[in-house]
């Protein structure tokens, strides 16, 4: 669960970014993203409940000097490449791909998180703000900041993925760039050739070179282009999506895959620790009993429930399937002709003078219009053996 202080966000002017992140995550779902399940708020904080991933972030494992093989790096590139292609289909640029924002599950599969500075592009538009972490930012982002290009697009995330892949294999980054490095100097650094150790395979180097191309048009930016590289030519991406390819590196299960100091800091240093929130809010609400609690909430922060969303989507799919079945049934049912109604003559023993018969259909058709056809059966009257009507009479008296 991720939670942020409303007051701290308002002081830093970051409240809009949190609201935007929740709106963005509520529209996304992918096997290699950290998916949002719930979002809610109280008087103090904004909460986001996401997938539980116990493997820790990639930065933690790099700091612990985990040696990732080329095969391990290649699988991570495939998994995150699938996530990037999904984001591109939804017009989303992440803009902050780095080891800190890549979480591992208990089996070692990678998941992308932290969409705080992500943006959704309009059709045929470019992003132009300088957003991200400098050591992982693509050359065109810096060129845009120097007003040398109009903007940048989805390939910036693939550059960042290439930097992460290089760092996983060599435990150093391909370029020496820091947060305080001037833009002009960064431009020169990124134009220098990248050094690849001799013991790295040619196929692995080829993959990194295509991810770290300084020209966005020549850079790998799709899953198909990944599949065309010699390193990943034999990878079954459908099995990758279904997580059927087992990662070589599995995070340890005997301890927390994170720095325990960070967990203790929240309990000791934090002025408003989460574990004391219930008691604290009870006092506040008691003191503000006469005020409207709704006025203390951020109206723009959406309340999201993925369970309800999945139920709604399932119902929509059922309705769509029913509609399609109905349309197919109607399209396949062809009426060749209509059989006219045949009237059967009704035998009657009543004299013609005693009843009025309805005109036949044929007679009505001669007139051009059938106004009404009476199909009520004629009354059946039983006759006596002598075929005479036995009507009782009474004597007539003058």
Positions of predicted regions on the chain:
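Conserved N-lobe beta3->alphaC-helix segment of eukaryotic protein kinase catalytic domains
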Residues: 3-28
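Activation-segment/catalytic-loop signature of the eukaryotic protein kinase fold
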Residues: 39
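Conserved short submotifs of the Hanks-type protein kinase catalytic core
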Residues: 44-57, 61
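Activation segment signature within eukaryotic-like protein kinase domains
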Residues: 76-77
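Terminal C-lobe "cap" of eukaryotic-type protein kinase domains
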Residues: 213-220, 224-245
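Eukaryotic Ser/Thr kinase distal regulatory-tail detector
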Residues: 247-398
